[in-house]
Amino acid sequence: MPTGFSLSGSGLKWFAMLTMLLDHIGAVLLEPHLADPTAAAVYLVLRCIGRMSFPIYCFLLAEGVHHTSHPRRYALRLLGFALLSEPAFNYATLGRWRDAGHANNVLFTLLLGFLALQILRALQARFGQAAPAATVLGGAAAAALAFLAEFLGTDYGAAGVVTIVLFYVLPPLFVKRRVGFCAALLPLCLTSFLEIFALPDVLLLDAYTGQRGRQNALFFYAFYPAHLLLLGLLAHGWQFV
């Protein structure tokens, strides 16, 4: 942990929420106005800033797997809020509440990543932490869940699931965990040039103290559908479609 600057889990969550909000302001409110040069410039800045959000959530999920004593409850909470958020996600991004062919919200990606980590941990408990069987079978499970993310069209797709797994696996393998963080970001960076703007996250994650900080779990979960609903209403008004 670096000296002079530190962040708790709560601090990281607040930062991730803020950057996510800025990203979605750009995506929902400004994207329809890209013909305007000023709107286009602000849009690009906000989307670049927003690239820092998702990797922090991936990291915190990987950390949460280490500490949760109720994995089933954790998974059900993710699933519940993913289902609750989907209409708001559709409305914010499309202007309608339902769309079977549209991408599914990022909480589904986090859920699939969480399931991949739980399977890996179960295999490690059975075969041993570094056993080849655990590595091969865990990798196969992660690949299957990453494929499922692509099939379902979840936000960030397979790259998102793989990033979650890498945030769990890689940092402990390096003397300087910053190297592991950089490696974990590679799948995202390969999906889009803009994802390189997530690299400053490495400094924030390295400042993580391992402490949870003051948290209200329900608030952090509820913020996701609430802010999407608000942005959707600002962008599209209220429509029963």
Name each model feature, range by range.
Residues 1-241:
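Alpha-helical transmembrane segments and their immediate juxtamembrane cytosolic regions
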